[in-house]
């Protein structure tokens, strides 16, 4: 990797912020979504076992159903996905000892890639609770997903309504060096 590409990668990592307000009318193109998903597919996984699975939801009815289920777990009536038109659900195979870490790395890659291609994203929790429920398991089965998968998280994806706030300064004791 040349120095310019490395600097751009580091810039993406330092400037990505969670977006909590999306334009629900502005759907990213399939091409942009595929670029983001490809980054998720190349996330590191324990022993290269690729335990995660991703479900890309652009269907509004399914997206709204996921929002409703998430809001129910959270105990609110508002949209936990902040109006994002695309939801990427990350699941991971519980039979792999590193499944939670694998799924978490996929989530990180998805959010960083979204920023790199000009999209906003936000990690939305409660996938575990949703997809451990009877209704969640029925959804997985209807999508052809068999096995013992745990919901790791949802990535809310789309165009931000406004620029996210600047990053807070990093805490002084974030890193300890032992030389």
Predicted regions and their residues:
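Acidic, surface-exposed loops and disordered segments
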Residues: 1-179
